[in-house]
Amino acid sequence: MVKPYLIEHKDEPLNKELIMHIHEMMTTKTLKNAEDEGKFRTTNDIVVANEITNEIVHQPPTYEEIPEFIEWLCKFVNEPAQGTFIHPIIRAIIVHFMVAYMHPFVDGNGRTARALFYWYMLKQGYWLMEYLSISRIIYRSKTSYENAYLYTESDDNDMGYFIHYHLKVLLNSFKELKAYIQHKSKEQTESLKIMREENLNERQAEILALYKNKTDTVLTVKEVQSRFAVSDPTARNDLMVLVSRGYLEEIHVNKVKVKYVIKR
């Protein structure tokens, strides 16, 4: 997985080899030509087009400019004390923008740009990034993402448009994480309450809490086994305990498969 690799290598300086390896990891088995994985493009036969209209929205700089750009990017990341102070978050956003703008690879530039953004944020001590998913939010607002680039290019490369968009993405990511933590905290509180009142073990209480929080929940032994990382016999026993206590009931889908629902 890419994220553990980014975490493991967050203290390393940025260099050409690291950028290429991150691209290779992000694009393995996803490109038309596997030889393009982890390699900078060597042609100018590349444009960025709108996925729906196929309208060309960006013509990346020539491939001859890529070596100089990579050298600049590494210096920008590795020597932040040089020149005007730029806040680390803004600097990370600039890295994201510039990699996607330059399009140093045949494909997978957006994925690589986002990975480098994550990496730089982790490098600067923003450990919470491990738990955020900006890619999901960018995917949901893809038009705004593309427009942020277009507005920047059309307004004399004023990167403020992209920075503003990206900060909103980060804020929404934090909000989603906060909501998730609050939801899980509520689930845990509910589980502890059930565990005390119903004399169940912690895992059984968590299973029952799932049903109480969402009464149309349907689980199988395999799903419990996967969700709680337990063996088949343990998952089966937990569900049978809840059945024997009158909380759940079995529904036989066929001769083999059994589903468990809350008892009405």
Regions found by a protein language model. Name each.
Residues 1-264:
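FIC/Doc superfamily catalytic core
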